[in-house]
Each structure stands twice: as structure tokens, then as C-alpha cells.
């Protein structure tokens, strides 16, 4: 079984302009300096390159890799500038888009800064029956704040699987909220809640293993390890070896598709991962899909 546990389908109307401009700054600077020498194929108003991916693209990726599923993570940016589409419009767009193939498992996303966030979660769960919810603390909340109590209680009561971002964030988003350690009080208070810390903790990787050692309901995914390619590819194996040797049944395969796909396809990423020596077939099968399938309740 092969499941990509970390996939995005972005809609330009939901993305904060400032974050996109921050992302594009080095590209635009290169164009301004060297554009007279090279045809770079874009103008100064080029869009964020990874939104508006045709639905056929992830379907083709699943087909080419004999993939059993993609977990599609929604992020609620409406309150921080992605306000040309309401949250409910965004969720309707996403779930409708994913309905064309039953291998998609779309998750809802609700910013806890909304005053009616718990009620919105309940409403969206009744409407769409998602398997889980995506958290993005960089929009401006600490996961362990007291004001989050009603939010987490609703998530727990509804039995939602949680995927939370960890690591770097682009302005106007703030990575100070994205430390894995901040999830410890939540994981301890709700031991039945399953929580996936994305990106192996990202730039706060050193906080991940102590958290997982303390809380056996905390998992992680390997998405965005492609960021080490091609110059420091050895880090992919190192990070995976470190995690799998400690928590073989609590790390899941993920890519952050489509963020790296133009440079390093899912197939290339898998080939790189396959350079490691697997401790057993069970550990390999758990990593690629069985653990995520159990978390989704489909195995």
C-alpha cells in the first residue's frame, strides 16, 4: 500500500499575497539582475507557481506510482489575507474537486482564531465527513493556549486525525507558533487523539523525538525532505534512519505535493528513499501506507 499523507490543492483566492511575494522575492530579484541575458518565461506579476495544478496531475501521479491514496490538506488563510474566498467556499471547492477520485482523502482546515471555530468544525464534519483536520499555527496561535481548549475538545469529540505544520513560515505567517513541543500539552490531555507533526518537525526537528518519546499518540511525516535535494541528498537517508530506528510505526510517507514536484517527482523521491536498507518488510509497508491507512480507519 502506498499513501501520500501530505498533499495540497491550493486555490489562489485563499493564499495571502504577502506570503506569495516573499516566496517569489529571490526569483524576481534574479529576473531583475539577469533577465536581459535569459528568457525566464515569466513577467513580474507571475503567480505562485504551485497553485492551480490541474486535477489530472495528482491523479496521474497516483497512477504512475501505483498509489492507493493522497491525503489532501486544506489550510484556512482567510483571516491573514487569503480572503477572496470564504472558508465555506474553499471547503466546497476542495471537496468537490476531490470527489472525482475516491483515492483522495481531503481534510478540513479551520483557523482557531475564528470566534466560532469549534462550531464551524462541527458543521464541516457533518457536511463532508472528513477523516481529519489540518492545523497551521503560523496564522497566529499557539496550540497550547488556554483559549484553544474548546477547539481541541471538538476535534477530539469528533475523532478527527490532526496534521499540524511545523517549522518555517513565510510572512505574514509566523514560525514562532510552529514548534512541535507546543503540541505536548494537547497530546497529553487527549491521549486518544492522533497527531501528525509534519515535515519531521522542519527547522525545529530537535524537538520532535522528545515529544514522540513522551506521547505515543504523536506521529510524523517525511514531507519536504526533498528540500535537501540535490546538494545534500544524504540528509534524506539520515533523517529517515534517525526517525525509523526510534519510531518505526509512527512515521508516514508524505511529499508536500505539488511543492517540489517540478524539480523532484514523487517517483524520484521514492527512489531516493529506497536507497536505505529496510529493517523489515513490515516497517517498509508501515512507512509507505499501512500506518497511515490505520490512522485513516481504512485498514
Regions found by a protein language model. Name each.
Residues 10-13, 77-80, 112-116, 168-172, ...:
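Active-site environment of divalent metal-dependent phosphoester hydrolases
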Amino acid at each position: 500500500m502506498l499513501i501520500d499523507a501530505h498533499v495540497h490543492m491550493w486555490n489562489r483566492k485563499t493564499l495571502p499575497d504577502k506570503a506569495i511575494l516573499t516566496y517569489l522575492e529571490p526569483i524576481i530579484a534574479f529576473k531583475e539582475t539577469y533577465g536581459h541575458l535569459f528568457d525566464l518565461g515569466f513577467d513580474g506579476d507571475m503567480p505562485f507557481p504551485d497553485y492551480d495544478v490541474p486535477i489530472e496531475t495528482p491523479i496521474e501521479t497516483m497512477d504512475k506510482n501505483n498509489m492507493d491514496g493522497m491525503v489532501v490538506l486544506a489550510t484556512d488563510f482567510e483571516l491573514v489575507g487569503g480572503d477572496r474566498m470564504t472558508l465555506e467556499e474553499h471547503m466546497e471547492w476542495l471537496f468537490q474537486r476531490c470527489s472525482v477520485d475516491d483515492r483522495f482523502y481531503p481534510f478540513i482546515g479551520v483557523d482557531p482564531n475564528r470566534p466560532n471555530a469549534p462550531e464551524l468544525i462541527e458543521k464541516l464534519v457533518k457536511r463532508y465527513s472528513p477523516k481529519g483536520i489540518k492545523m497551521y499555527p503560523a496564522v497566529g496561535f499557539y496550540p497550547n493556549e488556554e483559549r484553544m481548549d474548546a477547539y481541541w475538545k471538538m476535534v477530539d469529540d469528533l475523532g478527527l486525525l490532526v496534521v499540524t505544520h511545523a517549522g518555517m513560515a513565510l510572512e505574514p505567517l509566523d514560525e514562532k507558533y510552529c514548534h512541535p513541543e507546543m503540541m505536548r500539552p494537547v497530546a497529553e490531555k487527549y491521549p486518544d487523539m492522533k497527531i501528525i507533526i509534519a515535515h519531521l518537525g522542519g527547522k525545529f526537528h530537535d524537538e520532535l523525538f522528545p515529544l514522540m518519546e513522551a506521547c505515543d499518540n504523536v506521529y510524523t511525516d517525511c514531507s519536504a525532505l526533498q528540500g535537501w535535494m540535490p546538494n545534500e541528498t544524504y540528509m534524506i537517508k539520515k533523517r529517515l534512519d534517525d526517525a525509523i530506528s526510534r519510531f518505526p510505526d509512527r512515521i508516514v510517507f508524505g511529499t508536500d505535493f505539488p511543492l517540489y514536484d517540478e524539480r523532484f517527482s514523487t517517483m524520484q523521491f521514492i527512489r531516493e528513499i529506497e536507497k536505505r536498507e529496510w529493517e523489515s518488510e513490515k516497517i517498509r509497508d508501515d512507512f509507505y501506507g499501512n500506518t497511515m491507512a490505520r490512522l485513516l480507519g481504512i485498514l
